[in-house]
UniProtKB/Swiss-Prot annotation:
PROSITE patterns: INTERLEUKIN_1. Belongs to the IL-1 family. It is found in: Secreted. This is Interleukin-1 receptor antagonist protein.
Length: 178
């Protein structure tokens, strides 16, 4: 293949750079077009998520209750980091530290308004790690704390800093909702 070195080669190079630049380039400080996607999520014990009294619960939904299943809304920030929410991205999952206690909260925030470069939005960021068919989510604000469920059904979705403990489940199946 021969490289063209004519009078317009610099102009062509510039146009190609502009055409193929990253989607966040040219947007102010971390603002980028957000593409929210909805996913089905269930843990390795087949428990799905549902909302009860403004708390995210993991349990076995059957029959007419299957319509209570919450889809997880996800906005990718970069290759591994994501924002997670429910209810069309209007309630976002966050990791909050209070003294020695670290807990998962649902906050009324629009997921597409979050900004990866804002320190106050760090609590909404999760590191998505895939291992084979399963996915785990580690808090960026609280390293070592993972999204988890318990072995028992109908308990709150929470965070754990002991992901290998046998009574917690930190591996999830994650499938784009059709």
């Amino acid at each position: 293949m021969e490289i063209c070195r004519g009078p317009y080669s610099h102009l062509i190079s510039l146009l190609l750079i502009l055409l193929f630049r990253s989607e966040s380039a040219g947007h102010p400080a971390g603002k980028r077009p957000c593409k929210m996607q909805a996913f089905r999520i269930w843990d390795t014990n087949q428990k799905t998520f549902y909302l009860r009294n403004n708390q995210l619960i993991a349990g076995y939904l059957q029959g007419p209750n299957t319509k209570l299943e919450e889809k997880i809304d996800m906005v990718p920030i970069d290759f591994r980091n994501v924002f997670l929410g429910i209810h069309g991205g209007k309630l976002c999952l966050s990791c909050v530290k209070s003294g020695d206690d670290t807990k998962l909260q649902l906050e009324e925030v629009n997921i597409t308004d979050l900004n990866k470069n804002k320190e106050e939005d760090k609590r909404f960021t999760f590191i998505r790690s895939e291992t084979g068919p399963t996915t785990s989510f580690e808090s960026l604000a609280c390293p070592g704390w993972f999204l988890c469920t318990t072995l028992e059904a109908d308990h709150p979705v929470s965070l754990t800093n002991t992901p290998k403990e046998p009574c917690t489940v930190t591996k999830f199946y994650f499938q784009e909702d059709q």
